[in-house]
Amino acid sequence: MEISVASVTVSVAVVVVSWWVWRTLQWVWFKPKMLESYLRRQGLAGTPYTPLVGDLKKNFSMRAEARSKPINLTDDITPRIVPYPLQMLKTHGRTFFTWFGAIPTITIMDPEQITEVLNKVYDFQKAHTFPLGRLIATGVLSYDGDKWAKHRRIINPAFHLEKIKNMVPAFHQSCSEIVCKWDKLVSDKESSCEVDVWPGLVSMTADVISRTAFGSSCVEGQRIFELQAELAQLIIQTVRKAFIPGYSYLPTKGNRRMKAKAREIQVILRGIVNKRLRAREAGEAPNDDLLGILLESNLGQTKGNGMSTEDLMEECKLFYFVGQETTSVLLVWTMVLLSQHQDWQARAREEVKQVFGDKEPDAEGLNQLKVMTMILYEVLRLYPPIPQLSRAIHKEMELGDLTLPGGVLINLPILLVQRDTELWGNDAGEFKPDRFKDGLSKATKNQASFFPFAWGSRICIGQNFALLEAKMAMALILQRFSFELSPSYVHAPYTVFTIHPQFGAPLIMHKL
């Protein structure tokens, strides 16, 4: 009997181990090689597959090397931000594949194909390739299918244009506070001094999203922003290890720190939500800001058309993070480029004076700022908040003249496309806001050559919010100051989810 039990145990163990080995080989070798063969038969060029790691090691190595030294102001930033995709573009042409671990990733530069990918949201879905990113937020940005559609429908009213116009006084209040702080710094130094504008812009945009979306001051939400920034840095430091299967579940020191920060964010947010619920019960809270709309949806969850409490928390985390990140990077690169191009700074200031004089900017006037709109579009073209988007294919799909198998990723290289000389001309790398003087459609020839906020039905829900906030900030700054690059400024754009200035943005501010 004992021999029989032992035999069965050994047999079961052999079967389990054999199954595990087969599945591992399938994942690490057979499936990737099958997909590689499929893509090469389509005529696609790409890198040979390296088991398990793919091109991640080369990608990380080139990025680390690129970040190790700053660049000149007039240099192309693409070799510093996306060095590996840029090298592959030069080697293999405008459509090629590389390897994200064991997953082939097809990079496309053709605007028609990009439009197709971004318009077919149910076929080309979000690529969930970076599990640690979920610690910062998930929300509508990362959902697919019916859940994405439901959340988008619920959130949309908070970002209607008329609703955003009503937020302009809050924009003014938050922006005025940082401008007044800079004014005092400059006044104390006899009308000119060096100011690193980056921390101030981060604080200002954090305050705006706190006031407008959550009905609280930045003091209440400041800890959330700090924790999310710390979490983002920890994730970037861990990025190489994050692609090891199961790594995020290991009790490493880094993982414990990240999860502790994520838990603290959750606790603070729950406190903000509970505070709003108590205010609602007392009839003292708005229902039409983002948090009010989310809570209204949560109360209707039992009918099947609202959000769960967990979903609500994720949307709050997402808008705290994205609402602050997107506008702060847009503003910092606008100030850097206007410091470099004094003629455009003068034109923007003259327009602000013509529209507002010394009066407080209002929504109607902000929408009349054509020169400022051109400048912001050009900044978004040269310094998009994120350098690339990715999508996943789960079944065989036609894309242009290609037939792509399920199980591959699509990379949409925003930065490379928006600086592409074939699409934008030989001056694609130069700061020339005049290219937008006749509007976006004319500048882009109605094609997806400009998509800093994505495209189609998944276009960033907060793009109008971000642009109006940026116009308010720049109008107030231009009314009070002229500015130029400080001798201590070091040009080193790098990616921490969005494109940041690695060493800040010290400018010489002159009081007008």
UniProtKB/Swiss-Prot annotation:
Keyword Iron: yes
Keyword Signal: no
Transmembrane segments annotated in the record for this chain: 2-22
EC number of this enzyme: 1.14.-.-
GO molecular function: heme binding; iron ion binding; monooxygenase activity; oxidoreductase activity, acting on paired donors, with incorporation or reduction of molecular oxygen
This protein's UniProt keywords: Heme, Iron, Membrane, Metal-binding, Monooxygenase, Oxidoreductase, Transmembrane, Transmembrane helix
Database matches in InterPro entries: Cyt_P450 (IPR001128), Cyt_P450_E_grp-I (IPR002401), Cyt_P450_sf (IPR036396), Cytochrome_P450_Monooxygen (IPR050665)
Cofactor: heme
Binding-site residues, heme: 460
Location in the cell: Membrane
Enzyme class, broadest EC rank: oxidoreductase
GO cellular component, one term: membrane
One Pfam match: p450
Alphabetized Gene3D superfamilies for the sequence: Cytochrome P450
Membrane-protein topology: Single-pass membrane protein
Family from the record: Belongs to the cytochrome P450 family.
Protein name: Cytochrome P450 72A11
